[in-house]
């Protein structure tokens, strides 16, 4: 609710909508995803952010659970799959991403943009962290698959998940 919007700086401490909050509201999407799109302009990562936002707007892509919890695999599938069974969902995600990219181009660009010249996995983590800052997670020592979120809650990944041995995670969805 309001506390979340204040944490994301979309509302002021007094509950007034901020300039960023007004920009985000113009996208007509979940505030976290809208914030990710706005933040993406600062790093020139708009197309990537739109793809991520479109992916996160869907429950999951066909076969998504098979690849574990890493959104990087879903993003690759979005970009490369040509299987007929995936066509409807992935086409909808691609269309949504393109629509948001068009909306972003129509918005005044960020004044101080610094291109993000790191591997795509780090760019994805940065974008997700900008939308879900309280869900940054550090691995718990000696407990593979066990993480402590920035907000203080614990989170677990199955040992079979490739991310279970990661030192840190930028989390976009908790089940």
Regions found by a protein language model. Give the residues of each.
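Second RecA-like catalytic domain
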Residues: 1-175
């Amino acid at each position: 609710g309001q506390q979340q919007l204040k944490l994301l700086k979309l509302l002021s401490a007094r509950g007034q909508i901020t300039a960023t909050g007004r920009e985000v509201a113009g996208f007509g999407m979940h505030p976290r995803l809208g914030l990710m799109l706005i933040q993406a302009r600062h790093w020139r990562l708009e197309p990537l952010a739109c793809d991520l936002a479109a992916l996160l707007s869907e429950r999951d892509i066909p076969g998504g659970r098979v690849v574990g919890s890493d959104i990087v695999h879903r993003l690759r599938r979005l970009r490369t799959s040509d299987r007929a069974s995936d066509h409807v969902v992935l086409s909808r995600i691609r269309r949504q991403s393109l629509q948001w990219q068009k909306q972003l181009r129509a918005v005044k660009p960020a004044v101080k943009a610094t291109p993000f010249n790191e591997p795509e996995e780090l760019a994805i983590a940065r974008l997700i962290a900008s939308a879900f800052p309280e869900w940054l997670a550090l691995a718990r020592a000696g407990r593979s698959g066990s993480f402590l979120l920035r907000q203080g809650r614990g989170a677990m990944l199955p040992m079979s998940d490739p991310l279970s041995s990661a030192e840190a995670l930028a989390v976009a969805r908790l089940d």
